[in-house]
Amino acid sequence: MNGVTGRMGYRQHLVRSILAIRDDGGLLLPDGSRVQLEPLLVGRNAAKLEEIATRHGVEHWTTDLDAALADPRWDVFADFAVTSARADALRKAIAAGKAIYTEKPTAETSAEALELAQLAAEAGVPNGVVHDKLYLPGLRKLRRLVDSGFFGRILSVRGEFGYWVFEGDWQSAQRPSWNYRKQDGGGIVVDMFPHWNYVLEQLFGRVESVYARTATHIEHRTDEQGTEYPATADDAAYGVFDLAGGITAQINSSWAVRVDRDELVEFQVDGTDGSAVVGLFGCRIQPRTATPKPVWNPDLKDERDYRGQWLEVPDNEVFGNGFRAQWEDFLQDLVAGRPHPYDLLSGARGVALAEAGLRSDAEGRRVDLPELQLPTQPTPRLQADSGSDSDSAASADNADSASAASDSASASPDVPEVVQHTETVGARA
């Protein structure tokens, strides 16, 4: 586990996922048996690693990533370290035959992200990318509605995400200052568009084009040391996404907006037979048979309680931590020898959407997204099979696919590549 001294790597991936599974007796398999997990903590700060290991009863930790990758005892390489070091670490892990589980973005450019997906496919290495939003209660309820045919023909999706992030002067900011410096990898497009890509494509359809406008609404902020600095990164993005099947989605993302909704992110889905308003936890529906019939009349105050005319979807099951839920799915897929659906290719599509959004803003037009495909897609193998299958894994030149993925950025030299800094500290290759 590379990068466990940072906030997300420690809290969500180590403590609430891997250690929680370990403390429950191991990974529960469909036949009722369990597979126990043993983590190896990797990072650059030996003192922090030792403190975490002691606190949680973890036996193994190291600051030597290369030695960890060379050790055959470890089957899975999980990366939560800085994005700038991720691609090199993933390449080494793939070459070592490790299964891959990684945070987003998987690389700094879509071409590099696609290259990683191709390398993993050629090596037959199982791989997964964190798609945590799909495992949250609200979106799982939405998935049930979509699968049940509740909406009829889905027409549109509207999303609102964000909240007011204080400037850091008279009140401290609740997000780190690097988020607002483009040169440090900040910006809401590179942060949120990869999330919107997997939410849209997994629930509604592939993103075929994007029109986006970005803004830096707050031009000066104050950092953690009390020093004012120019905000060079976008703090808001307004996107329109054309999806396969004729669905139109529009999502506003902003760190300069005040919240007047039930949750920090909400999606409204409208279809011919019904609509839903979904957050991270809640889900309210209005079927066609219970839809009111408003009449526009600006001369009279409308006394209807429109929000009160929606029905709350019950939980009907116990929802656990979303990060742990995906970890369990990934590990069960790994043990069973089947591909994980949220893989490095899916991660590359998220990076490509962020690049296309930045290009759309720079050029003031809609940008089409080519469908990313790998020239070869052999069946991923288990770590235990590495010795016999590696030589026979199919190999092909992926230059054409990588070129298609990077066209959205290369056509405009002023469009920045997607670079995302994280707070997580991990070992550099």
Q: Model-predicted segments: where are they?
A:
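N-terminal Rossmann-like dinucleotide-binding module
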Residues: 1-56, 428-429
